[in-house]
Regions:
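Structural motif corresponding to the early beta-alpha repeats
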Residues: 68-94
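Short, active-site-adjacent cap segments at secondary-structure transitions
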Residues: 52-54, 84, 157
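N-terminal binding-site loop/beta-alpha segment at the start of enzyme catalytic domains
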Residues: 1-76, 113, 141
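Conserved beta-strand positions
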Residues: 15, 48, 79, 117-120, ...
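Glycine/proline-rich, positively charged
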Residues: 24, 36, 86-173
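Short, flexible active-site-adjacent loop segments at beta-strand->alpha-helix junctions, enriched
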Residues: 14, 19, 81-83, 124, ...
Length: 173
């Protein structure tokens, strides 16, 4: 199935790490078994977020994928940014600082050079839309993500981001 107007194709079902890896399931063998069944069943899309078990979801799921020896180019990996990762005032939201620092930490935890999709996990009313769009555009242009998108944004918020990106020569969600 095609993702939006991009050329990226994903399985109809994805395997996500929310409330699972690092929380209800912590045993790496069990995680590897789940990931193996998913991959053998045709799932190529593996979804995460930095805040899932404070980074453990990213670590454990991708460790299982590495252990299974699935070539990176056969996978579609995503992660998200927004929620607090610590008590630090800047370690949350969609500021340029948080977006750029979080992608690097996610890539390190996931043991990969890039994610296929990097999502704004929620809308951040405290950050100017231009800052958000420019930061995500920079992540894509730097090769750390191939696409960026949104999660739980309104249609109006997405339309604003797309219009701003087009008007500014930036990468749109």
């Amino acid at each position: 199935r095609q993702v939006g107007k991009s050329g990226l194709k994903v399985s109809s079902v994805s395997l996500g790490a929310w409330t699972t890896y690092g929380e209800s399931v912590q045993d790496q063998k069990r995680i590897a078994d789940i990931v193996k069944v998913a991959a053998e069943g045709g799932i190529n899309f593996f979804d995460n977020a930095d805040m899932y078990a404070r980074g453990q979801g990213e670590r454990l799921m991708t460790a299982a994928l590495h252990d299974l020896g699935i070539p990176r180019h056969h996978l579609v990996l995503s992660t998200k940014v927004f929620w607090p990762m610590s008590d630090d005032v800047n370690d949350r939201g969609l500021s340029r600082k948080h977006i750029l620092e979080s992608i690097d930490m996610s890539l390190e935890r996931m043991q990969t050079d890039y994610v296929d999709m990097y999502f704004a996990h929620r809308y951040d009313p405290d950050v100017p839309m231009g800052e958000i769009v420019e930061a995500f555009s920079d992540v894509v242009r730097s090769g750390r993500a191939l696409y960026w998108g949104t999660s739980e944004w309104s249609a109006a918020q997405i339309a604003e981001a797309v219009a701003l990106a087009k008007a500014s020569g930036l990468v749109a969600p």
